């Protein structure tokens, strides 16, 4: 494994690890020579893939190629762009962008600010960049591409790796009720996501009741600042990088619609709260009402006031509370409240009560009285509620 290791001496700066010899030079960049007619091939610092250029920059400003797509990635691109604009004091000299050929936040920002855009996968590095940066890109980069950057390609990951490897770390942080999160700067490796060595990390206490969107916005800004900090002393961070431990590895797969089904017999109040804050803004929580899917909207939290006969209620039992103007639903360990639902159209809690729970309605349709319970959805060929596996995932690790 090749490393840049810097030593300060009276004669200048000594670099080891770029080849099998020592090189000393007081300038920012170093040319490596060996005996004979040809220039020695320099190896990329992140692995032993041959790197063709003979001129390695050893301090900022850097030539950066940025890979990204969404608003989380856009925040890092904004910080890199701002650094490039700082004449004489920034860490970026050249900045170009690689993104998908779609209308995406990263593409819009790049075009608005006259940054050169490469459409993935048509990327031609041509020995013009010192380091790559990839954020929320979603595509594996091949080894021959990674090897063309002297300092490799850095990744900003919104978790404290190795916890929550995968495409949805912020959602799983909230879903599992983590009290601590953070950002990791790592070097990527080919063939697998989120397994490379760690260069820098920053810890962030998760605020109580934070949603995935709120946490994601905070970590995006934190990650962008941590990236700039890392680039300021990149050779030192590369030299002192550490491999990820196998202890504490967890997976953060993409969120899916099956996660939105509530299992009233198994979900606790806290688990439903975490589930809503994790996915509720993108995928409404769902249950069954009289055999029809119904979406639960405007979650109002755990209902703390005791109800007469509440202890004996069947999970999924629904009541209307006038004081809070919400529907109260019993779950494994208590009651949770929602202020609106979506059946065929959006209904407030009061509208739902008047249409389906009012004593006048129940007198007219006495057979419906036994059906006034929210039920977990069950597959046609199994008695197992859909979402039960996801219900277990909600439990704190």
At which residue positions do the language-model features occur?
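Short acidic-hydrophobic surface loop/beta-edge motif
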Residues: 262, 285-290, 327-332
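Low-complexity, glycine/alanine/valine/leucine- and proline-rich hydrophobic stretches
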Residues: 303-336, 344, 354
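A short acidic-to-branched-hydrophobic micro-motif
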Residues: 254, 261, 290-308, 336-344
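Short acidic/glycine-rich loop or secondary-structure boundary segments that cap or lie
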Residues: 194, 283, 295-297
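One-carbon transfer enzymes
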Residues: 2-281, 333-337, 343-348, 353-397
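Short beta-strand or tight-loop elements
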Residues: 181, 292, 325
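Well-ordered beta-strand positions
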Residues: 146, 175, 288, 319-321, ...
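NAD(P)-dinucleotide binding in Rossmann-like oxidoreductases
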Residues: 280-283, 290, 313-316, 340-345
């Amino acid at each position: 494994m090749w490393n840049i290791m810097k030593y300060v001496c009276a004669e200048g700066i000594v670099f080891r690890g770029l080849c099998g010899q020592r090189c000393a030079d007081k300038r920012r960049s170093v040319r490596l020579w060996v005996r004979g007619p040809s220039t020695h091939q320099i190896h990329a610092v992140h692995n032993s893939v041959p790197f063709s250029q003979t001129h390695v920059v050893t301090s900022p400003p850097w030539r950066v190629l940025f890979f990204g797509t969404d608003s989380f990635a856009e925040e890092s691109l904004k910080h890199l762009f701002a650094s490039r604009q700082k004449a004489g004091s920034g860490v970026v000299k050249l900045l170009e962008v690689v993104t998908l050929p779609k209308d995406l936040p990263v593409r819009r920002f790049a075009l608005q600010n006259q940054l050169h855009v490469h459409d993935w996968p048509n990327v031609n590095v041509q020995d013009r960049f010192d380091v790559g940066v990839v954020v929320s890109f979603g595509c594996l980069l091949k080894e021959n591409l990674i090897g063309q950057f002297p300092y490799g390609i850095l990744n900003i990951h919104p978790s404290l790796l190795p916890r929550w490897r995968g495409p949805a770390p912020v959602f799983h942080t909230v879903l599992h009720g983590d009290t601590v999160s953070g950002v990791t700067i790592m070097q990527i490796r080919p063939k697998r996501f989120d397994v490379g060595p760690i260069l820098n990390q920053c810890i962030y206490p998760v605020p109580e009741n934070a949603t995935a969107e709120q946490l994601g916005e905070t970590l995006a800004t934190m990650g962008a600042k941590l990236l700039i900090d890392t680039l300021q002393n990149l050779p030192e961070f590369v030299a002192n990088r550490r491999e990820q431990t196998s202890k504490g590895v967890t997976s953060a797969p993409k969120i899916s619609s099956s996660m939105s089904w509530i299992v009233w017999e198994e979900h606790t109040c806290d688990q439903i709260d975490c589930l809503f804050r994790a996915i509720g803004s993108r995928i409404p929580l769902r249950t069954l009402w009289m055999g029809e899917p119904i979406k639960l909207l405007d979650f109002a939290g755990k209902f703390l006031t005791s109800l007469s006969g509440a202890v004996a209620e069947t999970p999924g039992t629904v009541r209307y509370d006038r004081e809070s103007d919400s529907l109260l639903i019993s779950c494994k360990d208590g009651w949770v409240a929602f202020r609106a639902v979506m059946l065929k159209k959006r209904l407030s809690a009061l509208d739902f009560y008047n249409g389906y729970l009012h004593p006048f309605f129940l007198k007219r349709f006495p057979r419906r009285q036994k059906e006034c319970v929210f039920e977990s959805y069950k597959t046609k060929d199994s008695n197992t509620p859909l979402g039960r596996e996801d219900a277990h995932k909600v439990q704190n690790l």
